[in-house]
């Protein structure tokens, strides 16, 4: 392993398993291609798992949480105290992702990377405390070098825990008041797009609030003079603890050979950073949905991603990815359990 571990090689896809899965799809009792994207998903999962007939029984969900200093600029409709309160809700079973995890029989891990409440102690939460939230990136870099490295490593550790526990699919979620502002700032630099095209309502800003949010981002980017060619510096300067942890988790999963289902806008920004740092990890990323944040469509296009759902979601927490899990499971079930023409004694199409 190199010191910059995120540059280390990711696991290769199993091309032989993909070829076998592709051949199987041609023999199932249906017109070729008639299940559309579900067929491609089954074939991709075959390559990721190294199995002709992949399954998705073991799903690991990790929520990364952290507060954001840029909230001082009045860019959120909610107070920062909500971040810590939602951690309690996650482990208490009352949050959307908590309900979804139960329904999916998925594991749910909650990681506190640094909220404004330095004394917060909740059973069932991993408290790492890299700081009481990031610094206000409208005035100074969001993270120190040590904080950035620790956040990346926290994500990698979560990926490794998932792999050790036999996870076949990893979902990263996030919680942090102000994190759509950090995500929009990151995307603005990496995509070369004006912040006004990427800034949305987040947790419920009105039009004036969205405009103010974009202005705060533009002012911060002028202050820091960031370049897309240095994604790590961009992440440390305007990102968040939880976004950096997602980056580390996505790369860590690809290095460990665990498929990732990416959630919404913030998670897609983390995926973009991960791919810029290690392009090999892109093959391990599946994209769950196109959300309501205006910048999400632009991000997905930049990642050449085909989202599975479009439900107008903007909750975060990994909720959109969790909602897409049944679709992936059904794709695997159809691929693995449908009869072939020979097995069902059904006439195949003429050669």
Swiss-Prot record:
Cross-referenced PANTHER family: NICOTINATE-NUCLEOTIDE--DIMETHYLBENZIMIDAZOLE PHOSPHORIBOSYLTRANSFERASE (PTHR43463:SF1)
Indicate the family of this protein.
Belongs to the CobT family.
Q: Which cysteines are joined by disulfide bonds?
A: none
| Catalytic residue list | 317
Q: What's the stated role of this polypeptide?
A: Catalyzes the synthesis of alpha-ribazole-5'-phosphate from nicotinate mononucleotide (NAMN) and 5,6-dimethylbenzimidazole (DMB).
Q: What is one process in the GO biological process aspect for this record? A: cobalamin biosynthetic process
Q: Which organism is it from?
A: Pseudomonas putida (strain ATCC 700007 / DSM 6899 / JCM 31910 / BCRC 17059 / LMG 24140 / F1)
**NCBIfam families in the cross-refs:** cobT_DBIPRT, PRK00105.1
What is the superkingdom listed in this entry's lineage? Answer: Bacteria
Query: What name does UniProt use for this protein?
Result: Nicotinate-nucleotide--dimethylbenzimidazole phosphoribosyltransferase
Per its record, the protein catalyses: 5,6-dimethylbenzimidazole + nicotinate beta-D-ribonucleotide = alpha-ribazole 5'-phosphate + nicotinate + H(+)
The terms under GO molecular function for this entry are:
nicotinate-nucleotide-dimethylbenzimidazole phosphoribosyltransferase activity
Entry's InterPro entries? Nict_dMeBzImd_PRibTrfase, Nict_dMeBzImd_PRibTrfase_bact, Nict_dMeBzImd_PRibTrfase_N, Nict_dMeBzImd_PRibTrfase_sf
